[in-house]
């Protein structure tokens, strides 16, 4: 028991360090490309000329594609293990291919830092899980390998989103049946250790998103939250179907990986000429939506362009995560509804923010089929725990409808 406790804490601390180092590497590339270190790719896009804005994501995609293509071409052996930590935990034995995972993470760093509309958390969690896998193979029994990889993945998620409980449930819900409930203890300990470490490294204990404090929802607001869950239940499968169609369209072009990723990048770059907000994973835009939301038409325009950018990035094969882009789409959809509802003052002054947070949780639930994780993650990311009952209700509704329409979640379809 003591041994597991010590290993869990160690994996949590190292995972947080890995996530922090990846973020520092992103800031370093941002300084090289844009002479900025504020971490906002949207601000970087707005500060450069139009031709640079159009070409930078394409060049980043080209560089990442060349890296992946060269590795595949000159690697004379088949991968000894997967590079997907989900696969390693669910159907594998806990091993990850070290060299392939490192190359994939480096390629992700290139596309994320150059503006592609893809999440950075994919590489962060992969690297955390990779360290846990290497450690387990050397110091643990084979029957424990999956457990420690799960600890690394949960700790990476907790570090990236400041959400240790949601990071733990991310493993428990999405990989249901592959881990015994008794094994959840080390996963939670690793995730909490990761949060404490990342707070120490970043010099603060702020939530990921800063929002105004909301009171407990009124009965009519609970109804609207449930209604938004219903809408997300239909929107989630459509979003996943669009991602699958985009991927199929890019593959049908039969391009080499460098050209395929460059094409995805140029689409993002051209869209950014209309709205610079399409650059990056969407974190800064979500923060802006939650604090100073623009008008309905502007939100709608940004949403359409960002959605096309996400489809271009993911469809072209850009390595990265879809968590944060999904949160953005959900926040924008929710804020659109909230802005419309705000025309009726009886629904409350904070209805826009409430709907945006509900949209984030429900679309995440509809795409991951993990309602408890999605609801708890939004609460942890914002500190708005008074919303948890309403978010749980709306997320369960969204997940139920999404499962009925499309039994395969975003993680089963990738």
Curated annotation (Swiss-Prot):
It is a multi-pass membrane protein. The chain crosses the membrane at residues 5-25, 54-74, 116-136, 147-167, 169-189, 220-240, 255-275, 292-312, 327-347, 353-373, 381-401. GO terms for biological process: response to acidic pH. It is found in: Cell inner membrane. Gene3D superfamilies: Clc chloride channel. GO terms for molecular function: voltage-gated chloride channel activity. Pfam families: Voltage_CLC. Belongs to the chloride channel (TC 2.A.49) family. ClcB subfamily. Probably acts as an electrical shunt for an outwardly-directed proton pump that is linked to amino acid decarboxylation, as part of the extreme acid resistance (XAR) response. This is Voltage-gated ClC-type chloride channel ClcB. The lineage of its organism: Bacteria, Pseudomonadati, Pseudomonadota, Gammaproteobacteria, Enterobacterales. The gene is clcB.
């Amino acid at each position: 028991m003591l041994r597991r406790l010590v290993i869990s804490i160690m994996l949590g601390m190292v995972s947080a360090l890995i996530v922090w180092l990846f973020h520092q590497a992103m800031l370093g590339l941002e300084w090289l490309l844009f002479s900025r270190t504020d971490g906002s790719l949207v601000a970087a896009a707005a500060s450069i000329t139009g031709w640079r804005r159009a070409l930078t994501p394409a060049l980043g995609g080209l560089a990442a594609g060349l890296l992946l293509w060269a590795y595949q071409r000159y690697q004379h052996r088949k991968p000894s293990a997967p590079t997907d930590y989900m696969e390693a935990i669910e159907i594998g034995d806990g091993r990850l291919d070290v060299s392939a995972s490192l190359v994939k993470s480096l390629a992700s760093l290139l596309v994320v830092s150059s503006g592609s509309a893809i999440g950075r958390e994919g590489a962060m969690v992969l690297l955390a899980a990779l360290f846990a896998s290497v450690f387990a193979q050397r110091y643990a029994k084979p029957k424990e390998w999956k457990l420690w990889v799960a600890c690394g993945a949960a700790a990476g998620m907790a570090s990236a989103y400041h959400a240790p409980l949601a990071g733990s449930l991310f493993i428990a819900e999405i990989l249901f049946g592959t881990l015994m409930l008794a094994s959840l203890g080390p996963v939670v300990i690793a995730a909490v250790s990761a949060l404490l470490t990342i707070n120490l490294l970043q010099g603060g204990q702020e939530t990921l998103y800063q929002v105004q404090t909301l009171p407990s929802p009124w009965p009519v607001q609970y109804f609207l939250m449930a209604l938004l869950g219903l809408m997300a239940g239909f929107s989630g499968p459509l979003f996943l179907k669009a991602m699958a169609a985009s991927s199929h369209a890019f593959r049908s072009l039969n391009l080499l990986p460098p050209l395929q990723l460059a094409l995805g990048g140029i689409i993002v770059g051209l869209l950014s000429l209309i709205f610079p907000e399409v650059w990056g994973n969407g974190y800064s835009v979500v923060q802006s939506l939650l604090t100073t939301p623009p008008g309905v038409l502007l939100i709608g325009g940004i949403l359409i362009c960002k959605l096309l950018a996400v489809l271009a990035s993911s469809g072209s094969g850009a390595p990265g995560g879809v968590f944060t882009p999904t949160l953005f789409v959900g926040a924008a959809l929710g804020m659109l509804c909230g802005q419309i509802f705000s025309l009726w003052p009886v629904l409350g002054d904070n209805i826009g923010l409430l709907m945006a947070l509900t949209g984030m949780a429900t679309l995440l639930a509809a795409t991951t089929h993990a309602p408890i994780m999605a609801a708890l993650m939004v609460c942890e990311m914002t500190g708005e725990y008074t919303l948890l009952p309403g978010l749980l209700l709306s997320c369960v509704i969204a997940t139920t409808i999404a499962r009925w329409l499309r039994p395969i979640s975003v993680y089963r379809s990738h």
